[in-house]
Amino acid sequence: MAQENEKELQQLKNRFHDLAERSHAQGVFTFTGFLGLSDQEVFWQEEPGLRYAGYTLYGGCDQADRVVVRFGDSGELGYETDFPVVCIHIAPLAEKFADELTHRDFLGALMNLGIERSTVGDIRAGGKQAYLFCLDSVASFICDNLIQVKHTRVRCSVTKDFQDILQEEPETVNIQVQSLRVDAVISRVYNFSREKSLALFRTGKVYVNGRLCENNSRILKSGETVNARGFGKFVLTGEARETRKGRLAVDVAVYR
């Protein structure tokens, strides 16, 4: 299993370098598929050897967790091109009889179609509908074949009308901590024990601003985004204020 994982890791690294080299040598833009946080970390590890080609990351919407990397610089190449990313609106045929559907429900239905995970980006689910970002190469297939999610019959259509609908509304909470260490803030936001918080770091499940964070004592700054895989993400939205008891009070926007 370890050898298999190492092989996949090396293949991903090679893919990044191949795409960067092809962009640079042929004077064209090249694209990855959608990358999750762990694959993005591999990209950032390799980034010093890729930056010569120029690159841009984009996931289709603000604060996307899954992104596509485009290699190539429009200033150097002399032209611009869009990312091959489209948005699909998934809605019930009969809302009255539709289930309340979760992100997991929509993702499971998509994976049952047999498509690669790398062709699918963020899924913004709410109530009985969702907005899905995917590669344009699979959009028609999804629209033609995704007809049911859980027990709900659905229709799919490519849309550009999603900017307002897709704004996830975070829950703003005020927490008090001894310090802005990332492990302490995670413990307070999710009401974890210190041991459970530290376990997230040991298993590589904490990302700060899209980068793997292995240093649990890292001090967070206002505006930084923390992803705790499996639990959600949050953003420090204000400056810390000292309380009368010497603790730090800070506002956090929590995305469940």
Regions from the PLM with identified roles:
Residues 223-224:
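Structural motif
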